Each structure stands twice: as structure tokens, then as C-alpha cells.
From Swiss-Prot:
Organism annotation: Idiomarina loihiensis (strain ATCC BAA-735 / DSM 15497 / L2-TR)
Stretches for region Disordered: 44-64
Keywords from the UniProt entry: Metal-binding, Zinc
Stored InterPro entries: DNA_gyrase_inhibitor_YacG, Znf_NHR/GATA
A Pfam family the protein falls into: YacG
Gene3D superfamilies per record: Erythroid Transcription Factor GATA-1, subunit A
Protein name (Swiss-Prot/TrEMBL): DNA gyrase inhibitor YacG
């Protein structure tokens, strides 16, 4: 018996097996769409933002 999941991008049923190399996505296209949404900050993990203090870092003096 195989398990099926919905593609997070398009909701198409995807068999959870070696036959579906892009799982949980139905395709590489849906995988890249999801990656783009994270990169554009359209998706995020819920919770309070974390502020990382670093006294050695000064944005104005950075060479990068």
C-alpha cells in the first residue's frame, strides 16, 4: 500500500515513493515555485522574529 500526499504548491496527489523524486512536490516546477515563495518572503515560519546581536558587525563599515 502506498501513501499519497498533496503537492504543497498545486495540491495534486503525489505518491510518496522512489517513483516521485520531487516529493512532496509533484514536479520540479512546483518545487521551484515553492522555493521562490520562500525567497520572496511570501512564506515564513510563524513566531516572533529573532534579533541576533553581533557587536563585531557594523553595517556602515562593511566591505560587502
Amino acid at each position: 500500500m502506498s501513501i499519497s500526499v498533496n503537492c504543497p504548491t498545486c495540491q495534486t496527489k503525489v505518491e510518496w515513493s522512489e517513483k516521485s523524486p520531487a516529493r512532496p512536490f509533484c514536479s520540479e516546477r512546483c518545487k521551484l515555485i515553492d522555493l521562490g515563495e520562500w525567497a520572496n518572503e511570501e512564506k515564513s515560519i510563524p513566531g516572533e522574529p529573532v534579533v541576533i546581536a553581533n557587536d563585531d558587525y557594523n553595517n556602515e563599515e562593511s566591505d560587502y
